[in-house]
């Protein structure tokens, strides 16, 4: 049976960076793509079915995109492989390598980057606009990326301080009956913001910034924030 092949010749340490630790990325590609993948030395060859017009083009686009990601200095892992295949096989118009190369901030020896097209659009919107509303399911990075953008702005001296805030009262809720000060009452609502901040800074650094007021918290109200974020 005739087959169609496409061969990529890689240079330097590109091959191990593409295949991942213990070839984890390669195994994931073999599961997600219908083309056969053969690796020999510095060459990676795709073998596709000529009767399936979408087989080889998708595989070729995925490998090309992952190589672009590697060449931009991004550490490609299995989730990135999965998202690359998903984006290129779906309706998304975003180029995966451009998504993964969207750097938010370097913290504690690692780089926080956008992981999806939606996250890329979110961080770009925060950079361009004064107020941005992020709406979506839990666990999609809304709070974490907002905090990462705030930390980056503070480090770059684009703002003087970060103000952590949430509405003092949730929709249909009355906090008046709860014991303690207003700060005591809203503290649980700010917990995800605290957790994100502590993940991006050493505990002592986070405490120092809160003690000096570089990072402060308050309930949402009319407030002068010309040089705050």
PLM segments and residue spans:
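Hydrophobic anchor at the beta1->P-loop junction of P-loop NTPases
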Residues: 134
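The conserved Walker
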Residues: 138
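Conserved glycine(s) of the Walker
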Residues: 141
């Amino acid at each position: 049976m005739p087959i169609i092949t496409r061969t990529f010749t890689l240079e330097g340490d590109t091959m191990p960076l593409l295949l991942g630790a213990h070839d984890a990325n390669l195994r994931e590609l073999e599961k997600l793509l219908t083309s056969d993948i053969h690796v020999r030395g510095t060459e990676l060859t795709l073998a596709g079915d000529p009767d399936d017009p979408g087989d080889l083009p998708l595989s070729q686009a995925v490998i090309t995109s992952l190589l672009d990601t590697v060449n931009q200095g991004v550490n490609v892992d299995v989730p990135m492989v999965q998202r690359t295949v998903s984006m290129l096989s779906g309706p998304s118009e975003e180029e995966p390598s451009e998504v993964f190369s969207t750097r938010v901030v370097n913290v504690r020896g690692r780089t926080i980057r956008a992981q999806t097209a939606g996250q890329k659009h979110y961080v770009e919107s925060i950079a361009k606009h004064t107020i941005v509303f992020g709406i979506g399911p839990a666990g999609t990075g809304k709070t974490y990326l907002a905090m990462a953008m705030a930390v980056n702005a503070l480090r770059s001296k684009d703002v003087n301080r970060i103000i952590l805030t949430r509405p003092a009262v949730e929709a249909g809720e009355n906090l008046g009956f709860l014991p303690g000060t207003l700060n005591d009452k809203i503290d649980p609502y700010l917990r995800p913001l605290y957790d994100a901040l502590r993940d991006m800074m050493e505990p002592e650094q986070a405490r120092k910034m809160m003690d000096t007021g570089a990072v402060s918290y308050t309930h949402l109200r009319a407030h002068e924030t010309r040089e705050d974020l």
